[in-house]
């Protein structure tokens, strides 16, 4: 599986952004919108955006695969956030139009406690051995997904630590117009970040599964490359999102040669998301578990067992996958 950049922090927008004082269509109760101007940002230009690989921005929750307890483990995103007093000081500092990077944090006292197994995200800056909060006052990080942790039950549904495998959605290796759901060794995903999508994630924009039979999958970041993207102009991108079948996606993430990731979200361009007919649901999908040695070893209710029952079947679209339970 070809590796592109991994998502270890918030990605900047490809365009310079401006704040508009009107209710956000992305976040409820947010009284402002962050919109893209027509100017390509310095960060994007410095990262050589014109030579970058554009990929689909998938709407889910970010995950990471790295070692825990001497084996590959799935980790869930958990950002450390300031306690109430520190958050109040930080907000007052921002209201005075100061640069958030100049705010002084006492990491040991200003932040809510993290689980013992929490680790900071890879690219987090450190001073004197302490992670430095980002411009939002958060410290990005990860916690391992334990099998019986109810808080991360949807994460744990897509991994099996006994057989060290994960349920992954990607292009079929021999047909780029066909999607494939397969059981992938966790060792093949080490040090990669992925997006968890499904029934109980972010309002389920792709319409997967049902309340009775939830369905969740992992998608490696950068898995869906965009082949025919227009020029990097505001109006051309708006037209592409609105008029092209391939544009029925949440946004674009450019993977730059220096490892930098740059994005644009439909909301940056004043466009709606979620939308009724996504590009992800316009392509057929095949189930290819390839798990003979494990056939009888799965819990009867687990996702791996459900997918084994429909192994080698082809569906017109992801939405059509229904388990006969």
Swiss-Prot record:
Outcome, altering residue 250 to Q: Abolishes RNA ligation activity, in vitro
UniProt PTM: AMPylates itself (auto-AMPylation).
An MF annotation (GO) of this entry: ATP binding
EC number: 6.5.1.3
InterPro entries, per the entry: RLIG1 (IPR041211)
Its job: Functions as an RNA ligase, in vitro. The ligation reaction entails three nucleotidyl transfer steps. In the first step, the RNA ligase reacts with ATP in the absence of nucleic acid to form a covalent ligase-AMP intermediate and release pyrophosphate. In step 2, the ligase-AMP binds to the nucleic acid and transfers the adenylate to the 5'-PO4 terminus to form an adenylylated intermediate. In step 3, the RNA ligase directs the attack of the 3'-OH on the 5'-phosphoanhydride linkage, resulting in a repaired 3'-5' phosphodiester and release of AMP.
Name of the molecule in the record: RNA ligase 1
